[in-house]
A protein has these predicted regions:
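Extended serine/threonine-enriched, polar tracts that run as long, contiguous segments within proteins
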Residues: 107-192
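OB-fold ssDNA-binding interfaces and closely related basic DNA-contact patches used
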Residues: 1-129, 176-177, 181, 240-255
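Long, compositionally biased interface segments
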Residues: 153-255
């Protein structure tokens, strides 16, 4: 599995010119860039991360949950929920330090799937022909958190599991003062594709990854509660760990 990213740079450390505003993925021996990709989402999850940029350190992270409903408990490694994230509407009463800390806590849309890079090139501008069906994880946040939900929610509303469709994705250039950033733009006409035995294996890998990640976080959560002298509801945490995994997958894929 590789990480899908948005390249904002015009040049790399070696002085190579890069296509800013392109999708990118670092593969063994090379980094691939493309203005457009075909993206087939297999699994969608949500995870809170608390990252302290000053010390370049991950402070806390939550389990990967299947939704963000207010009633959904999303435990984290420090024995709290959602890394202590407080809704923006409720932050007026926070101290200055606590309010600043809230800016370090981000919610990510974790999108596991495969991507085919269209008219792909490497860092030297050479064409790359084999960046096809690359298993990827895209951690979308900020301005990129919502756009992909439009075609995915449309499929869900039609009772069409998004796992069986691919989306053509490009990037829109945006400006906020002197800041330039790029936002994913997704075709609203997803294409139905075959779900192959190889795809089933890739899905199993993704689910194992999510399960492993959640198991580690739940263990840290339980350990934190014990250190604080708080009761641990073992049954509740077990249900949380299991239920966030696969109850949104088509029955044909969960056996």
């Amino acid at each position: 599995m590789f990480y899908l990213k948005i390249n904002r740079d015009h040049e790399d450390d070696s002085g190579n010119s890069l296509p800013a505003g392109s999708w990118s993925v670092s593969l063994p021996g090379t980094t691939v860039y493309a203005k457009e990709i075909d993206f087939q989402v297999f699994v969608q999850r949500y995870q809170y991360l608390h990252y302290d940029a000053e010390v370049n350190e991950m402070v806390n992270k939550s389990v990967m949950a299947k939704n963000l409903y207010p009633q959904t408990e999303i435990p984290d490694m420090l024995g709290t929920f959602r890394c202590g994230s407080v809704p923006a509407s409720q932050r007026d009463t926070l101290s200055a330090d606590k309010a600043l800390q809230q800016k370090e806590i981000k919610c990510f849309r974790m999108l596991f799937g495969k991507a085919t890079f269209i008219d792909a090139v490497d860092e030297t501008g050479k064409k790359v022909e084999d960046a096809v069906d690359v298993p990827i994880l895209w951690r979308a946040r900020g301005s990129n958190f919502m756009p992909i939900s439009v075609p995915m929610d449309a499929l869900t509303a039609q009772k069409k599991p998004f796992i069986f469709y691919k989306l053509r994705a490009s990037l829109d250039k945006k400006k906020n003062g002197g800041l330039v950033y790029y936002v994913g733009k997704f075709d609203n006409a997803p294409k139905l594709v075959d779900f192959t035995p190889e795809d089933q294996d890739t899905l199993a890998y993704f689910m194992d990854y999510i399960n492993g990640e959640n198991t580690k976080v739940i263990k840290e959560y339980d350990d934190s509660l014990r250190k604080q002298g708080r009761m641990v509801d073992q049954e509740a945490t077990t249900v949380t760990s299991d239920d966030v995994l696969n109850d949104d997958l088509p029955e044909s894929l969960t056996g």
